Amino acid sequence: RYTYLLEDACGPLAYVIFKPEEGEDGKIGNVRELAFAKPEGLRQALGFLYRLGAQYEAFRIALPEDVPLAALLEESYDTAPTWINQPMARVIHVEKALQAKAPGEGRSYTVAVEDQLLPGNNGVFQVSQQGGAVTVEKLPEGAQADLSVDVRVLTQLLIGFLSLEEALYKPGVTLSGNLETLHQAFPKRAAYLTDLF
């Protein structure tokens, strides 16, 4: 396994960890991790791997889904993008997890959560923000919820893997209102988890 750190005058730009493997047509560089501080770091890392082309037939690289790879490569004829996103995550304490999802000053939202493995996660939770402080309160049983989800969908919303609209395609997810606040609390963003379980 090889590890390389790429820097400029201001400090680290990116790092690359890869392992040589035998492929069908020759040696493949299997990039286990590629992290970059800014777009220039990604360009430098890809350029570095390109310079190793005499030793490797190809490189297999996992990148965040929001990286416009075709726009970065001048000649992307030999790229074969595939979608291999299998992140594993699970909320184990709903109240603490929702604490990180502020609704916006003076706003609140409610989420009904169902968790078949951890009964303490079941219930309707109200998340409020006042004076910069976020509070999460478990409401009495039967309270109305703006959003109803199981813990798996909640986890995907919390890490930004799903947008609110995408979550609505999942079975058992219902939206009753407060759409604008829920959008602010659960924005979609690139999920880039490279740890293997």
Label for each model-derived stretch:
Residues 1-197:
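Intrinsically disordered, low-complexity, positively biased terminal segments
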